[in-house]
Amino acid sequence: MNTISPEVKTALVTGTDHGVGFSLAKKLLSRGYFVIAVRIDETEKQIDALQSSYPNQMAIFCADIGSDESVFKASNDIKNMTDHIDLLINCAGILGDMNKNLGDDLDFDEIMRVINVNAIGALRIT
């Protein structure tokens, strides 16, 4: 069941919990886009407040961009909403534990977790 009209420009933005992803979602809403906001943290309420200002112009989905299963579930839910996305903006990213990434004893599991989200995650969501 598609609920977004094909005439409406639709943007999917990841990392909308806060920061750049949140700011871009806000700007796109002000320009008339329907925004599909993807976040990882349901406790971040900033994006919820934005949705209350644009209730008919926004949908929020939770997904861990570092997880195939999580992205697959979110993408199926999004496909039920729309059959088109005009603009995809990948803003989801993590720094990881900097002590494990920059210290003398590198933690390669932590480094791979960061790469999985920041590099592979962008491909996964695309």
Predicted features along the sequence, with ranges:
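Conserved hydrophobic beta-strands of the Rossmann-like cofactor-binding core
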Residues: 10-13, 88-89
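Conserved glycine-rich cofactor-binding loop
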Residues: 17-18
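Conserved glycine-rich Rossmann-like NAD(P)H-binding loop of the short-chain dehydrogenase/reductase
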Residues: 31-47
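The beta1-alpha1 cofactor-binding region of Rossmann-like NAD(H)/NADP(H)-dependent oxidoreductases
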Residues: 62-73
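Hydrophobic positions on the long internal alpha-helix
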Residues: 89, 125-126
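Conserved mid-core segment of classical short-chain dehydrogenase/reductases
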Residues: 95-112
